[in-house]
């Protein structure tokens, strides 16, 4: 009886840890739903209030063709900011703070002035991860 109970508890613990791991993984399907909030200003294939986001993962900041960026965003790209998954996840939490810290860390605090056009903040870390997984699917 005790052996059977231990087996059941072991299986339950394993299943629980699997579901916890799955919940924290990036989910492009969930990210697509989160992206609907972004569509107020963004599309994958054309510039609007914000730049086109197709191909953003891996792109140098401030370089979407035909989009006029704020000096803060442009300067970040000139200083070497590339939109890796981690950088986008951190940026979405607080765009202005992220860019200013990036420039300051690069020794360019004098260029860390003004604000980016991106006023939206996405506080939920899982949603940020999910939306980045979705952005990675856009070409």
UniProtKB/Swiss-Prot annotation:
PROSITE patterns: CYTC. Heme c binds at residues 38, 41-42, 118. GO terms for biological process: photosynthesis. The keyword Transport applies. One of its GO terms (molecular function) is electron transfer activity. The modification Pyrrolidone carboxylic acid is found at residue 26. Residues 1-25 form the signal peptide. Binds 1 heme c group covalently per subunit. Keywords: Electron transport, Heme, Iron, Metal-binding, Photosynthesis, Pyrrolidone carboxylic acid, Signal, Transport. The keyword Chloroplast does not apply. PANTHER family: CYTOCHROME C. Belongs to the cytochrome c family. Cytochrome c2 is found mainly in purple, non-sulfur, photosynthetic bacteria where it functions as the electron donor to the oxidized bacteriochlorophyll in the photophosphorylation pathway. However, it may also have a role in the respiratory chain and is found in some non-photosynthetic bacteria. This is Cytochrome c2. It comes from Rhodopseudomonas palustris (strain ATCC BAA-98 / CGA009). The lineage of its organism: Bacteria, Pseudomonadati, Pseudomonadota, Alphaproteobacteria, Hyphomicrobiales.
């Amino acid at each position: 009886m005790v052996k059977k109970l231990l087996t059941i508890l072991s299986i339950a613990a394993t299943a629980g840890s699997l579901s916890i791991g799955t919940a924290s993984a990036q989910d492009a399907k969930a990210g697509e739903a989160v992206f609907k909030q972004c569509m107020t200003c963004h599309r994958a294939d054309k510039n609007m209030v914000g730049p086109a986001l197709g191909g953003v993962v891996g792109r140098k900041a401030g370089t979407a063709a035909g989009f006029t960026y704020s000096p803060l965003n442009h300067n970040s790209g000139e200083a070497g900011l590339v939109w890796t998954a981690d950088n986008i996840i951190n940026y979405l939490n607080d765009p202005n703070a992220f860019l200013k810290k990036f420039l300051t860390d690069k020794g360019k605090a004098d260029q860390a002035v003004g604000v980016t056009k991106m006023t939206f903040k996405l506080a939920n870390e899982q949603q940020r991860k999910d939306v980045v997984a979705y952005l990675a699917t856009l070409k």
